[in-house]
Amino acid sequence: MTATEELTFESTSRFAEVDVDGPLKLHYHEAGVGNDQTVVLLHGGGPGAASWTNFSRNIAVLARHFHVLAVDQPGYGHSDKRAEHGQFNRYAAMALKGLFDQLGLGRVPLVGNSLGGGTAVRFALDYPARAGRLVLMGPGGLSINLFAPDPTEGVKRLSKFSVAPTRENLEAFLRVMVYDKNLITPELVDQRFALASTPESLTATRAMGKSFAGADFEAGMMWREVYRLRQPVLLIWGREDRVNPLDGALVALKTIPRAQLHVFGQCGHWVQVEKFDEFNKLTIEFLGGGR
């Protein structure tokens, strides 16, 4: 699929099998084949999340400049959904390492929002030779609330859906994701609920949540380790983020040696959706595609 062809779910859809304590099927989208620089996109962890929907306003634009791989993280989209696994970010980073090996990728920039940002950081810490520049949007594992209450409104809504997975609870969760509530259309809610409400997805969601309280939970506390990152890191936050509030960015900004922070006003947790045009330009420039 070249950068000039029309991009659809079907035309970009790919599968790979990697080994993480046994075979694990990963689904991903590929676009911009032929461009020199590969960029990997990692979606967030809300119910019904997947790479195609989370990056629907970004893939085609980024593919004009980069070879884009938008990966469904384990337990999401069309990737395998296990009922048990270790700390999620480390588990997902191991799966991503397997995909890198299978595709023959070297050092690659990573773009991750929320849970995907945490996976990107875990990957960069565990496999430093394979991770290039990082673009992190409201990333999990780095956000330490200095002023906002914890758990946040978004985390509470996520927990409520896990306990009672209804369409109404999903819509309430999605509305917390954004500043502009008009973005949460009935069609989007239906699409996300169809993905989130299958028995396999519900099992995977609970396994993901449980993994943050397991014996290896400290692998998710990456704010304690990010001083080791040596690549440039772009932190992007929505001022009205109610999942990982803006004050949570300050520890990461202070600790990551080559970090910079960009904040969008009138924007919630879904920066790449609400401010897609500005986000795309900022990301392209930071990753070198604007030259």
UniProtKB/Swiss-Prot annotation:
It is an enzyme of class 3 (hydrolase). Keywords: Aromatic hydrocarbons catabolism, Hydrolase, Lipid degradation, Lipid metabolism. Pfam families: Abhydrolase_1. It catalyses: (1E,2Z)-3-hydroxy-5,9,17-trioxo-4,5:9,10-disecoandrosta-1(10),2-dien-4-oate + H2O = 3-[(3aS,4S,7aS)-7a-methyl-1,5-dioxo-octahydro-1H-inden-4-yl]propanoate + (2Z,4Z)-2-hydroxyhexa-2,4-dienoate + H(+); 2,6-dioxo-6-phenylhexa-3-enoate + H2O = 2-oxopent-4-enoate + benzoate + H(+). The record marks 114 as: Transition state stabilizer. GO terms for molecular function: 2,6-dioxo-6-phenylhexa-3-enoate hydrolase activity; 4,5-9,10-diseco-3-hydroxy-5,9,17-trioxoandrosta-1(10),2-diene-4-oate hydrolase activity; hydrolase activity, acting on acid carbon-carbon bonds, in ketonic substances. Its EC number is 3.7.1.17, 3.7.1.8. One of its GO terms (biological process) is steroid biosynthetic process. It comes from the Bacteria. The active site is at 269 (proton acceptor). Cholesterol metabolism contributes to the survival of M.tuberculosis in the host by helping the bacterial multiplication during earlier stages of infection and to the dissemination of the pathogen in the host. Homodimer. Catalyzes the hydrolysis of a carbon-carbon bond in 4,5: 9,10-diseco-3-hydroxy-5,9,17-trioxoandrosta-1(10),2-diene-4-oate (4,9-DSHA) to yield 9,17-dioxo-1,2,3,4,10,19-hexanorandrostan-5-oate (DOHNAA) and 2-hydroxy-hexa-2,4-dienoate (HHD). Is also able to catalyze the hydrolysis of 2-hydroxy-6-oxo-6-phenylhexa-2,4-dienoic acid (HOPDA) and the synthetic analog 8-(2-chlorophenyl)-2-hydroxy-5-methyl-6-oxoocta-2,4-dienoic acid (HOPODA). Belongs to the AB hydrolase superfamily. HsaD family. This is 4,5:9,10-diseco-3-hydroxy-5,9,17-trioxoandrosta-1(10),2-diene-4-oate hydrolase. The lineage of its organism: Bacteria, Bacillati, Actinomycetota, Actinomycetes, Mycobacteriales. The gene is hsaD.
